[in-house]
C-alpha cells in the first residue's frame, strides 16, 4: 500500500517458503499486541507470500497440504482485510483532505496520543479548533473519519477473533513439511517460466479489458492479475525478478492506489458524508485527479511496442516450447498422484502407436484427428491419477481430478475435457451415449470419445502386467476404411495396399507379446470395445521381426 512502511528494522532477507511461514507466526504475535497499520500490513504481506508460493507450487505438486495451507492463509488474510482497508482509507483522507491537515500526520508520527487508534488521533487533531497550525476542518473529512473510527474499533475485534481461531500449531507443522516438497522443484525452472506465461496471458487479457472500459471492476481485476504474475516471478524466477522487480512493484503500486481511491470514493458516497453538492464535487475532483495521474502513468509504461508487457513476454517461452512445457507440467503433476507413472507413460506410447496405425490404415475419428490424438495422449498419461485415492473406482476419481486440474497453457480446454471422459472409461462399464458423462455431448463428440476410450482400453491391457514387456505394436493389415473396389494406380502399381474385407480381422502385431501369458487374457477381454468401434474382429499376435519404434508425442 502507498503509505505504510514495515514497523521492524531488521533486514528483509528472503530465504524461501520456510522463512515466510515462520514470519507469519511472528507477525501474528505483533498484531496481537498492536492492531496498528504496520503490524496488520506486515502480517498480510507474509500471508500473501505464503499463499502465492502455494499457488505456484500446487500447479506442479498435487500434495493436498498446499491447498489446505493456502486456504488457511486466505481465511486469515481476508479477515484482516477490512481492518487494513480502514487504515488505508484513513491515510488517504488525511492526505487528500482539502483543509490540508498535514500537520495532523506530523503530530501522529511524532508520537502524540500513542494509545489511540490512528483514526481518532487524526480526527482529534483536525477537530481541535485551538490548534494554531490547523486549517479549517473539512466537514466531509471529519464525518468520514468518525465513521472509519467506529469501523476500526469493530474490525479490531474481528481481527482478534481471527487470530485466536488461526491454527498456529498446524501452520507450524506445514512450515516443516511443505518447504521440503518445494525444494524438489528447481527455482528458475522452465516450468515456472511456463507458469509465469500463463499468468502473463491472463493479465494481458485483463489489461486489454481495462483499457477499453476503464471501470473500477476492470482495474481491480487487472491489479489482481498483475499481482499473480508478479508473485510467480518474485517467488520462482530469480533472474527475471532481479531485472523486473522495480517495474513490477511500481505497476502494482499504481493499480493498488487506483483501487484505494475507488474504495475511498465508494465509501464516502455510500456513507453520505458530503454536507452539500459543492463538497461532493470538490472531493470527487480531488480523487479523480489522483486516480487519473496513476492511470496515465500506468498507460505510459504498459502501452506500445516497447511497453513492459513486451519486455516481459520476450523472456518467456515461445512457439512449440509452450506445449512441450505444458506436457512436462502435466507429467510432473501426474507423477505425484499415479503410483506407477512409468506404466502410464508406456500406455500413452502404445495408445499413440495404435492410433497412428489406425489412421494409416484409413480409419478416421469423428472429430479433428490432431485434437483427438492430443486427447488420447493426455487421457493415457493421466488415466491412473485416481489411484492416489485408492484402487477402487479410481477411473471415476481420475475423471474428477483431470476435470478439476485446469488447462495448462498450450493445451486446448476441449481436448483435456475430452481426455477426462476417455480416462473415465479406460476400465469398468463400457461407455454408452446415454451415460451421464456423454449424453450432453454432440453426436460426433460422443462417437469420438467412445473411439478413443476403445483405443485406451486396449493399450492399457497391453501393459496389464505393468512390466513393459510389450514394447511396441503395429497394425499388420492396413486400409480399414477404404473400399475394396477403389484401386487407384500409378504406373500399374497400386498406390496403397488392398483393403481388408468387411469381416476380416484387424491384426495387431506386438513386440514382446505371448499368447499364453496372463496379459493375453486381459487383452482378449478388453478388445471388445475396439471391435465394436471398428466393426470387425481385432487379433493380437507376436511380432516376428521387430520394427523400429514409431515416433510418438
Positions of PLM-derived features:
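Short hinge/gating elements
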Residues: 229, 328-338, 435-446, 511-515
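Short edge beta-strands and adjacent turn/loop segments
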Residues: 469-482, 495-496, 500-505
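A short amphipathic beta-strand at an alpha->beta junction
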Residues: 534-549
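Intrinsic, low-complexity polybasic segments
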Residues: 105-106, 110-111, 484-486, 492, ...
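Active-site flanking loop/helix segments enriched in acidic
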Residues: 8-9, 188, 326-346, 381-387
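Cationic, histidine-enriched alpha-helical/coil surfaces that engage anionic ligands
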Residues: 1-325
Amino acid at each position: 500500500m502507498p503509505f505504510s512502511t514495515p514497523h521492524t528494522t531488521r533486514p528483509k532477507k528472503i530465504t524461501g517458503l520456510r522463512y515466510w511461514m515462520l514470519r507469519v507466526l511472528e507477525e501474528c504475535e505483533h498484531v496481537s499486541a498492536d492492531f496498528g497499520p504496520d503490524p496488520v500490513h506486515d502480517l498480510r504481506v507474509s500471508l500473501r507470500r505464503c499463499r502465492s508460493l502455494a499457488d505456484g507450487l500446487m500447479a506442479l505438486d498435487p500434495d493436498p497440504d498446499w491447498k489446505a495451507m493456502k486456504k488457511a492463509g486466505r481465511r486469515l488474510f481476508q479477515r484482516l482485510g477490512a481492518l487494513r482497508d480502514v487504515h488505508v482509507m484513513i491515510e488517504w483522507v488525511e492526505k487528500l483532505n482539502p483543509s490540508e491537515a498535514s500537520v495532523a500526520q506530523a503530530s501522529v508520527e511524532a508520537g502524540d496520543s500513542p494509545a489511540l487508534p490512528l483514526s481518532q488521533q487524526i480526527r482529534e487533531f483536525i477537530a481541535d479548533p485551538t490548534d494554531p497550525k490547523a486549517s479549517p476542518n473539512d466537514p466531509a473529512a471529519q464525518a468520514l473519519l468518525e465513521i472509519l473510527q467506529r469501523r476500526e474499533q469493530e474490525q479490531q475485534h474481528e481481527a482478534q477473533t481471527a487470530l485466536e481461531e488461526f491454527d498456529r500449531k498446524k501452520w507450524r507443522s506445514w512450515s516443516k513439511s511443505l518447504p521440503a516438497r518445494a525444494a524438489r522443484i528447481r527455482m528458475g525452472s522452465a516450468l515456472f517460466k511456463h507458469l509465469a506465461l500463463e499468468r502473463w496471458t491472463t493479465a494481458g487479457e485483463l489489461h486489454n479489458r481495462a483499457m477499453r472500459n476503464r471501470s473500477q471492476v476492470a482495474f481491480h481485476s487487472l491489479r489482481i492479475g498483475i499481482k499473480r504474475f508478479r508473485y510467480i516471478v518474485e517467488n520462482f524466477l530469480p533472474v527475471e525478478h532481479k531485472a523486473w522487480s522495480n517495474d513490477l512493484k511500481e505497476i502494482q503500486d499504481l493499480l493498488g492506489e487506483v483501487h484505494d481511491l475507488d474504495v475511498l470514493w465508494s465509501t464516502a458516497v455510500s456513507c453520505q458524508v458530503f454536507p452539500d453538492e459543492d463538497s461532493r464535487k470538490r472531493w470527487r475532483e480531488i480523487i479523480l485527479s489522483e486516480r487519473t495521474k496513476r492511470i496515465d502513468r500506468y498507460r505510459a509504461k504498459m502501452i506500445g511496442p516497447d511497453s513492459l508487457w513486451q519486455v516481459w513476454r520476450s523472456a518467456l517461452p515461445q512457439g512449440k516450447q509452450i506445449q512441450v512445457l505444458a506436457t512436462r507440467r502435466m507429467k510432473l503433476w501426474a507423477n505425484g498422484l499415479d503410483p506407477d507413472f512409468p506404466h502410464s507413460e508406456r500406455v500413452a506410447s502404445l495408445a499413440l502407436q495404435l492410433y497412428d496405425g489406425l489412421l494409416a490404415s484409413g480409419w478416421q475419428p469423428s472429430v479433428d484427428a490432431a485434437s483427438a490424438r492430443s486427447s488420447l495422449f493426455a487421457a493415457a498419461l493421466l488415466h491412473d491419477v485416481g489411484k492416489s485415492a485408492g484402487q477402487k473406482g479410481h477411473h471415476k476419481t481420475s475423471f474428477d481430478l483431470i476435470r478439476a486440474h485446469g488447462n495448462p497453457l498450450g493445451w486446448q480446454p476441449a481436448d483435456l475435457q475430452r481426455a477426462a471422459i476417455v480416462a473415465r472409461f479406460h476400465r469398468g462399464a463400457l461407455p454408452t451415449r446415454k451415460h451421464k458423462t456423454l449424453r450432453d455431448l454432440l453426436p460426433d463428440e460422443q462417437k469420438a470419445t467412445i473411439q478413443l476410450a476403445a483405443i485406451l482400453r486396449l493399450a492399457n491391457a497391453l501393459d496389464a502386467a505393468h512390466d513393459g514387456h510389450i514394447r511396441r505394436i503395429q497394425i499388420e493389415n492396413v486400409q480399414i476404411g477404404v473400399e475394396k473396389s477403389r484401386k487407384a494406380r500409378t504406373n500399374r502399381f497400386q498406390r496403397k495396399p488392398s483393403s481388408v474385407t468387411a469381416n476380416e480381422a484387424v491384426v495387431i502385431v506386438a513386440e514382446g507379446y505371448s499368447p499364453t501369458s496372463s496379459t493375453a487374457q486381459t487383452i482378449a477381454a478388453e478388445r471388445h470395445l475396439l471391435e465394436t468401434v471398428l466393426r470387425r474382429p481385432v487379433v493380437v499376435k507376436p511380432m516376428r521381426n521387430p520394427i523400429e519404434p514409431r515416433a510418438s508425442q
